[in-house]
Amino acid sequence: MTRIKRGVSSKFRHKKILKKTKGYYGARSRSYRIAFQAFIKAGQYAYRDRKNKKRTFRKIWICRINSAVRKHGLSYSCFMYKIKKLSIFIDRKILSDLAVLNKEAFSELIKKVKSIS
């Protein structure tokens, strides 16, 4: 049985990781061992932040709705309660877009909500 050296396969594996860590700072882009650790950690951060992104955007939408609703003399919680009571099922993303991009439609919605005592 002949001996098989692993230089070619390891070089390919190293090049693959170093290519993925190209823009990293310092040894993280040059040294394979450190680059591999940085690559693994980057994957962990990416996985975590894909989950956190959903939370962050929900917070942003709520802040936008709250600030727009307070200009009309309502609180966010009161507005959401009344909107559910009217059976208007618009999610927070669409409500925040209305508040920012289409102020006339949002003010009409608030008039409708204010008509309920």
UniProtKB/Swiss-Prot annotation:
MF terms (GO), sorted A to Z: rRNA binding; structural constituent of ribosome
Superkingdom of this protein's organism: Bacteria
Keywords: Ribonucleoprotein, Ribosomal protein, RNA-binding, rRNA-binding
GO BP annotations listed: ribosomal large subunit assembly; translation
Entry's Gene Ontology cellular component terms: ribonucleoprotein complex; ribosome
Name recorded for this polypeptide: Large ribosomal subunit protein bL20
Similarity-based family: Belongs to the bacterial ribosomal protein bL20 family.
Function as written in the Swiss-Prot or TrEMBL entry: Binds directly to 23S ribosomal RNA and is necessary for the in vitro assembly process of the 50S ribosomal subunit. It is not involved in the protein synthesizing functions of that subunit.
InterPro entries cross-referenced by the UniProt entry: Ribosomal_bL20, RIBOSOMAL_L20_CS, Ribosomal_protein_bL20_C
